[in-house]
Regions:
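PDZ-domain C-terminal substructure recognizer with occasional recognition of PDZ-binding tails
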Residues: 2-3, 13, 66-106
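Residue-level detector of conserved catalytic or cofactor/ligand-binding positions
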Residues: 174-185
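Extracytoplasmic/secreted envelope proteins and their assembly/folding machinery
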Residues: 21, 42, 62-69, 115
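C-terminal, low-ordered peptide segments at domain boundaries
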Residues: 86-151
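N-terminal targeting leaders that route proteins to membranes or the secretory/organellar pathways
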Residues: 1-23, 63, 76
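PDZ/PDZ-like groove recognition
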Residues: 14-45
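Conserved PDZ fold ligand-binding element
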Residues: 41-63
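Terminal peptide-recognition signature
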Residues: 24, 41, 48-51, 79, ...
Length: 186
């Protein structure tokens, strides 16, 4: 409970957040080097899982996962992931696609961005209360580690209806480095 004066707001803000691990958005087939459809990750990881390490190496970026898979040369990988808050481990053996690249058959992402509103400020802190941050592709509530808040220009407002929430659309200039970030989220 806050026992201090606050100033109500409602100002729009751009939000950028890094996921805690990499989010599995989908598990999908591809054609292997023999032209056959395959999906090494099928039945192992699924939409909404967070891959947090592979062969003992912590994963925080999509590029880290891609590099480990590429360097595997098709050897089985021990994948540690989180599903519904529970840590699990499985083995996945990457397969070579028609272009010679090793793949798992999992579409992943490591960040999310969007627009929100500042609820109130108290001089040094701000609060943005409301709904959780969810992935647009899966609807899964995001597990985030860090991020930032940025200025944004609203370009369109969609009115809400009884079965459809309203929506702000806008543009934010988001640089992961400091220059455009207003506040750090941690």
């Amino acid at each position: 409970i806050f026992d201090r004066p606050v100033v109500p707001s409602g100002e729009a803000m751009g939000i950028y957040m890094k996921t805690d691990g990499v989010l599995v958005v989908d598990v999908c087939s591809f054609k292997n080097e023999n032209g056959e459809s395959c999906c090494p990750a099928d039945g192992k990881v699924c939409t909404g899982d967070y891959i947090v390490s592979v062969d003992g190496m912590e994963i925080s970026k999509r590029s880290e996962l891609l590099d480990i898979v590429a360097e595997s040369q098709g050897d089985s990988l021990s994948v540690r992931y989180i599903r519904d808050g529970e840590e699990k481990v499985c083995s996945i053996t990457p397969e070579k696609n028609e272009n010679g690249a090793y793949l798992l058959g999992a579409w992943v992402k490591d960040d999310v961005s969007g627009i929100g509103t500042v609820t109130f400020v108290d001089g040094t802190n701000f609060m943005a209360l409301g709904h959780s941050v969810s992935d647009i592709d899966t609807g899964v509530m995001m597990r985030c580690s860090t991020g930032g808040v940025y200025t944004t220009d609203i370009t369109n407002i969609s009115k809400s209806y009884s079965s459809e929430p309203g929506r702000l659309q806008g543009l934010s200039l988001i640089h992961i480095s400091e220059p455009t970030r207003l506040r750090r989220i941690s």
